[in-house]
Design a protein with these regions (language model features):
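N-terminal Rossmann-fold cofactor-binding loop
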Residues: 16-22, 36
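Conserved Rossmann-fold cofactor-binding substructure of NAD(P)-dependent oxidoreductases
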Residues: 28-50
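NAD(P)-cofactor binding segment of oxidoreductase domains
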Residues: 49-90, 124
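Conserved Rossmann-fold NAD(P)-dependent oxidoreductase catalytic core, especially the SDR/UDP-sugar
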Residues: 76-117
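Glycine/proline-rich active-site loop of Rossmann-fold NAD(P)-dependent oxidoreductases
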Residues: 120-123, 132-134, 145-159, 185-189
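Substrate-positioning beta->alpha
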Residues: 149-154, 165-186
Length: 189
């Protein structure tokens, strides 16, 4: 909702898709009920969509659910929207595509060598998007924190995570509001 609210504040019209749209009114967001893994549920999407932010959530943390959501779902949605009016697609990915880098700096020039299924599937989705005839942007986020995203803090408090003792120790963290601002900025380029 953070991205949608920022887009609305800019004066943009916002359509949002979820399997189960929220019951609460979130202002001027036009909610659509559909399932990215079910192409037939995407048949009646509005025409004239110019920008797409793709940041879905798989219903399970396992390879088939990730592929169905990030790869197949992206293809289904692009097919349903058509390419006529679509000018830009932004995929929210993850630094998991880089795999483990042994504590070294990671940037856009670091080779993507995912170790887990999540990184491998996200990289596949990135490649699918790059092959499309539309301007595409991939934002590889890591360490989101903020309201509702306190997993690391909760693990530290519960003793299930430890603070590294060796210095320096670098971590990738971004506040959810800063991530939303970055997405909106990239859409406007």
């Amino acid at each position: 909702l953070r991205v949608a609210q920022r887009l609305l504040a800019r004066g943009d019209e916002v359509w949002a898709l979820r399997r189960h749209p929220p019951m609460l009114d979130h202002g001027a967001i036009h909610w659509l009920s559909a399932d990215l893994t079910q192409p037939e549920s995407l048949r009646n999407l509005p025409r004239g969509i110019t920008r797409l932010v793709y940041l879905p959530t798989p219903d399970r943390r396992e390879p088939a659910a990730y592929r169905a959501t990030f790869v197949d779902g992206l293809q289904h949605l692009l097919d349903a929207l058509g390419r006529q009016s679509l000018q830009r697609v932004l995929l929210v990915s993850s630094s998991a595509v880089y795999g483990e880098q042994g504590g070294h700096w990671v940037d856009e020039h670091t080779p993507a060598v995912p170790r887990g299924f999540n990184g491998a599937v996200l990289l596949e989705a990135e490649q699918l998007l790059a092959a499309q005839p539309v301007t595409s942007i991939v934002l590889r986020l890591a360490g989101l924190y903020g309201p509702g995203r306190l997993q690391l803090l909760e693990r530290l408090r519960a003793g299930r995570a430890a603070v590294p003792r060796t210095l320096p120790h670098w971590a990738n963290r971004i506040h959810v509001d800063d991530a939303a601002a970055a997405i909106v900025h990239l859409l406007a380029l």
